[in-house]
């Protein structure tokens, strides 16, 4: 926690003390440029939830999409999504990092729709919502995905310089 700013520390502590958001299938979105600590904050939140006996699973966005896409090719998409329902919280790291094919974004959208109001997500993205049309192939899908994600969400926009860059300048 010491590595984060006072506001980020307050967020982590608040989320720890008020984890009711998990029981109501709320989401946490961490949005900001590369290197500002989004994944570290997501990991801290996930660790705190695990300490509270909440089932959490971590995916890079690419790994999740590839897993779901393979399940769809095998005609097992619903089974794969249902298997993930045993986790109260799923972390999707770097949702905006990789441009996905139409087929991959379709399964990502289906997954978001499946989790809506039934399970919590912690999502990190280096793309603000105004650029999520680069993630999803059409405007209607983009709007629908964002709408479902933010409905019961805490949205944290993180600004600042890259911690990795700061560290490299010190060395």
Task: Give the ranges of each region predicted by the language model.
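Hydrophobic positions on the alpha1 helix immediately C-terminal to the Walker A/P-loop
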Residues: 41, 45
């Amino acid at each position: 926690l010491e590595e984060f700013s006072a506001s980020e520390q307050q967020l982590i502590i608040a989320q720890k003390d008020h984890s009711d958001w998990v029981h109501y299938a709320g989401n946490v979105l961490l949005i900001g440029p590369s290197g500002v600590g989004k994944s570290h904050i997501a990991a801290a939140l996930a660790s705190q939830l695990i300490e509270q006996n909440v089932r959490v699973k971590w995916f890079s966005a690419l790994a999740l999409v590839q897993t779901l896409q393979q399940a769809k090719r095998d005609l097992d998409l619903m089974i794969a999504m249902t298997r993930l329902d045993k986790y109260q919280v799923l972390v999707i790291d770097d949702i905006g990092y990789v441009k996905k094919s139409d087929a991959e974004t379709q399964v990502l959208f289906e997954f978001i729709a499946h989790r809506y109001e039934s399970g919590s997500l912690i999502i990190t993205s280096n793309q603000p919502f105004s650029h999520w049309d680069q993630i999803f192939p059409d405007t209607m899908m983009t709007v629908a995905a964002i709408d479902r994600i933010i409905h019961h969400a805490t949205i944290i926009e993180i600004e600042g310089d890259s911690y990795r860059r700061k560290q490299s300048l010190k060395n």
